[in-house]
């Protein structure tokens, strides 16, 4: 009799163990994933022209091509540089068929503007002063149930590495403080000259200033586009997307080298992450 009781007890334990260790249902897995991970697709693009042109800012005739790239790649947010102003942004938003809303930064000492486009209709935009320039930050959610993130669109001085360094330091100070309450991504054209063989480094401190600027960013943020290679003509990697160091996963990282039109000298950089 006792043998039957032992066998019955073992059978009950097996059933209980099978139920306990059974794989969760797909809905449970989905809910768990949504609680622990949020995906985000970002794109940055300097849509201006090469230095030899009379006007190196973005050209209105190129906006349909810019809109086509954005609609095709479907990023959650876009950082743009070298727009001529708010009128140009409104034209671009119209070409995007109401899928995005956006803003341009305040005007600094120059004649061109940074901008951010986002899908989130509830996004807010904040100008960020750095030296005599203005970057622009957007706070938004990639999905309704996702945590808030911040994307900062930046454009550092193209001609003076010391000014780039001062600009970068102020920008990162702001980003570090903001990152205490939300993940921060910094995207744009930093114009860093980090290749020792670059002829413009001869008899200058450009390499030193730019290397220290880049290192300063990497103390708090991760270079998400490093694997994608050059982002501009003449073998330059001067466009970046920096993000938190503790991302769960970095997915697609790509420079869209067939996207440039007219005499653009930059290509868009696309990065997908989970955080």
Place the predicted regions along the sequence by residue.
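Solvent-exposed loop/turn segments at secondary-structure junctions
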Residues: 47-50, 83-87, 108-111, 123, ...
């Amino acid at each position: 009799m006792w043998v039957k009781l032992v066998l019955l007890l073992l059978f009950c334990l097996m059933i209980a163990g099978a139920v306990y260790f059974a794989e969760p249902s797909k809905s449970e897995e989905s809910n768990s994933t949504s609680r622990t991970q949020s995906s985000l697709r970002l794109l940055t693009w300097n849509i201006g022209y090469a230095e030899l042109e009379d006007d190196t800012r973005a050209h209105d005739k190129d906006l349909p091509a810019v809109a086509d790239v954005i609609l095709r790649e479907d990023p959650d947010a876009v950082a743009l540089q070298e727009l001529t102003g708010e009128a140009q942004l409104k034209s671009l938003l119209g070409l995007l068929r109401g899928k995005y809303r956006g803003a341009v930064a305040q005007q600094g000492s120059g004649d061109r503007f940074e901008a951010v486009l986002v899908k989130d209709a509830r996004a807010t935009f904040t100008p960020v002063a750095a030296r005599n320039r203005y970057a622009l930050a957007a706070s938004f959610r990639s999905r309704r149930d996702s945590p808030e993130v911040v994307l900062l669109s930046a454009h550092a001085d193209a001609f003076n590495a010391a000014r780039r360094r001062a600009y970068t330091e102020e920008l990162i100070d702001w980003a570090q403080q903001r990152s205490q309450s939300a993940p921060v991504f910094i995207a744009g054209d930093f114009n860093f000259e980090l290749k020792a063989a670059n002829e413009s480094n001869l008899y200058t401190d450009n390499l030193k200033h730019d290397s220290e600027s880049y290192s300063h960013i990497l103390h708090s943020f991760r270079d998400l586009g490093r694997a994608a290679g050059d982002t501009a003509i003449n073998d330059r990697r001067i466009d970046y997307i920096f993000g938190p160091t503790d991302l769960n996963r970095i997915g697609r990282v790509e420079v869209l080298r067939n996207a440039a039109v007219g005499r653009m000298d930059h290509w868009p950089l696309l990065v997908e992450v989970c955080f």
